[in-house]
Regions:
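A glycine-rich beta-turn/hairpin centered on an aromatic-Pro dipeptide
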Residues: 412-418
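Short beta-strands and strand-coil junctions in structured, solvent-facing domains, enriched
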Residues: 78-81, 299-300, 434, 457-458, ...
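Transmembrane helical cores of multi-pass secondary ion antiporters/exchangers
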Residues: 1-403, 407, 417
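Short, compositionally biased
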Residues: 465, 485-488
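Short aromatic/hydrophobic contact patches that present stacked aromatics
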Residues: 92, 424, 474
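Cytosolic Rossmann-like ligand/nucleotide-binding regulatory domains
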Residues: 428-480
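Short glycine-/aliphatic-rich beta-strand segments at the starts of folded cytosolic domains
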Residues: 419-427
Length: 488
């Protein structure tokens, strides 16, 4: 079956429905949803139910749009106060770590491809290109698994991995693009390569900062009667940021990530609506992107390089990633050995390497189909081996801790412009022994009870209300000066 105007909506809706149902099942058992989305795409593809989707350029465009949204949303969720203590190791891992992973893996691929038993041969530059496409990690899958297991990480590992995963995709992208240019232009020297890196970094970072500030200003100053248009305005900024940065020869992915950080760490109007919109859009983008990549691959072609791809994947998991991590973290003495081992293990490959593997295909690089199939196979190996063992490894290394509760049980949030905090409190037996009415409770100064939840019933509070064990109180209090400083 091929895609037509008549059946595209039907096929798309079925794929989305199946993906969500399968993803929900996998979420319960700690299986990466990314893996399941890819599998659904493969099952419906040319070697499965027969959906024909072979245009790498279309897949690349879909991936570019989806990745822009995902990186911007990831930037919005990155908080300055959380990443500040681990800024150094996070940045080193996302830059030097990517370079080292690409170098070690590329040299290994070149060595393996020259062996007599190998069914592939790749010159050194193509080997490095292959390694570069899969040198970035996908920590989003890691945290989805940890959330499904109700698990968090000790020693600031979570923000460090979030920072690495959010900022290492631009580095892998630059390596991929520069190596494609080098392969196709024999006259490109070392100076031109270094210059290209510097320009992409500087322009990308500057554009992200400036346009992020502009987005904040417009969201807060532009008076739109329909508040549902504010998230759409921000989405327009995401695409504008990527496109204008790319037009200026900068790194668009770096720009949207930095712009997301700027927006997420400043006061903006209609924050709740914007976050809800972006969260849903991010999930939709991931599902569509993974499905398209699953449809694009031909499993029978992938199996032809399975042996070599498996060997490369094992090298990356056991040697390449750990060696890069340990070298990058050498200057940071406070990071424990167990933490280094865990960071080495969670170098999960996701959809981004597959997207980057379409760039050589579109550019017509010799051996590009081979690169795509190897990257796809290694991504599946990584998700199966590493993705299903993350929580187990965290427990073995004693790095796991219970997931802290966020928000409140009432589903209520305050607008950003209201300078107060919401929290909730559950009444215990010991509390009732000291005070059994609201007026007798010793609440902190400046704290008010907004509503009381008793079972499924909501009660309007007054001073004489008799409290029961298990009652939940929604509290509003003045924001502390320390919190205000952190948010500025």
């Amino acid at each position: 079956m091929i895609f037509t105007a008549e059946n595209t909506l039907l096929i798309g809706s079925i794929l989305l429905f199946v993906s969500i149902v399968v993803g929900k099942t996998g979420y319960r058992f700690g299986v990466p949803t990314l893996l399941l989305f890819l599998v659904v795409g493969m099952l419906f593809g040319s070697d499965g139910l027969g959906l024909q989707f072979h245009d790498a350029k279309d897949a690349q465009f879909i991936g570019m749009v989806a990745l822009s949204i995902i990186l911007f949303s990831g930037g919005m969720d990155t908080k300055f106060r959380e990443i500040k203590p681990i800024l150094g190791p996070g940045i080193v891992l996302s830059t030097v770590g990517v370079l080292l992973t690409a170098l070690f893996t590329g040299l290994f691929i070149w060595w393996v491809s020259g062996m007599s038993w190998s069914n592939i041969y790749l010159p050194i530059t193509t080997s490095l290109l292959l390694a570069s496409t899969m040198s970035s990690t996908d920590s989003a899958s890691v945290f989805a698994i940890l959330r499904s297991q109700k698990m968090n990480l000790k020693h600031n590992l979570r923000p460090m991995l979030e920072l690495e995963s959010g900022s290492n995709d631009p580095m892998a992208y630059m390596l991929t693009i520069v190596l494609i240019q080098f392969i196709q232009s024999s006259g490109m020297g070392v100076g031109a390569i270094v210059g290209s890196f510097v320009i992409q970094f500087i322009v990308g970072a500057a554009a992200g900062y400036v346009l992020g500030k502009l987005a904040i200003r417009m969201l807060n100053k532009l008076n739109i009667d329909n508040q549902a248009l504010y998230p759409i305005l921000l989405l327009a900024f995401v695409f504008f940021t990527f496109s204008i940065t790319d037009l200026l020869k900068g790194n668009g992915y770096l720009a949207v990530y930095i712009a997301g950080i700027m927006v997420g760490n400043n006061k903006i109007m209609h924050r709740k609506d914007i976050y809800t919109f972006m969260d849903g859009l991010t999930w939709l983008s991931q599902i569509i992107m993974f499905l398209c990549l699953g449809l694009l691959v031909n499993p029978h072609e992938m199996l032809e390089v399975a042996a070599v791809a498996l060997l490369i994947g094992v090298f990356m998991i056991i040697i390449g990633r750990p060696l890069s991590v340990f070298l990058c973290l050498l200057p940071f003495r406070k990071i424990t050995m167990k933490s280094r081992i865990f960071v080495s293990w969670v170098g999960l490959r996701g959809a981004v390497p597959i997207i980057f593997a379409t760039y050589p295909v579109v550019a017509g690089v010799e051996g590009s189909n081979l690169i795509f199939n190897i990257v796809f196979f290694i991504t599946i190996v990584s998700l199966v081996v590493q993705g299903t063992t993350i929580s187990f490894v965290a427990r073995i290394l004693n790095l796991s801790k219970p997931l802290e509760k966020t928000g409140n049980d009432f589903g209520v949030e305050l607008p950003e412009e209201i300078d107060s905090d919401l929290s909730d409190m559950t009444i215990t037996k010991s509390m009732l022994e000291e005070a059994d009415t609201l007026k007798d409770m010793n609440l902190p100064k400046g704290t008010l009870v907004m509503i009381v939840k008793r079972g499924d019933e909501f009660l309007i509070p007054n001073g004489t209300l008799k409290l029961h064990e298990g009652d939940k109180l929604l509290l509003i209090s003045e924001k502390s000066k320390e919190e205000e400083t952190d948010s500025d």
